[in-house]
Amino acid sequence: METVAKLRETPHWSYSAMQCFITCPLKYKFRYIDNAEVERTGSCFPFGRAFHAALSERARIGIDMSEREVCDVFEDFFKVECEAAQNLTYKQNEDYDTLLQTGFRMLEAACENWMDDYAVQRVAESFSVNVPGLSKPLIGEFDCVVTDGKDTCIVDWKTSSAKWAVGKADKDLQATAFCYAFKAKHGEKPLFRFDVITKAKSPTVNNHYTLRTDDELNRFVSLANQIEKSINSGNFYPNETGFSCGECPYADRCKKWR
């Protein structure tokens, strides 16, 4: 299977694109249709990519990789990602050095609570599957696939400013889309687990398990088709009540929209 970077070179759907349209149709237009220039890049994006890179290496190498080595990977990737980011912006009371130390604490917590040393099947597994009715394949990448008891489980690593509410994972579109893709690719329904690490002075690690029924997977197909139909109809409008407006990379362009 080609890497997800290679898969992105051809027309495709992704969970991120679908979620973007649901969250704010106008943002979807700016990003995926207009290819508008990014006005600002929130620090959470290079931070998240570097954090994922570090945990991916930990999953690949296994128990022989020390916490210090995991943190070194994070530091290297974070530096590169920050240098490449367009108009990088930090939140109040936040800068490169404070985020670096936050990342170290979070990774130490993640390593101390690591539970998959002898269960990892695949790391950064890309996928490209067809969804009935869609004009393009659905692509993406599973962070990690493990054996969880008798079940196969997709693991997705998340950084978060706060602990997740109970039940959040059961409604998450990413888990639905990824479970659909896994079943389409491998012929079995997996469990799904979000490992949520909080950005805090004393980070916490919480595991949120969820699964999807056949009915929920069929509902995803209907949702995906409605999203594509809406986009093809040109239904783009701002959602100014969205939680992500504060860090939107197209905020200035949005203000000029009529």
PLM feature segments, named:
Residues 1-258:
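RecB-family 4Fe-4S metal-dependent nuclease core
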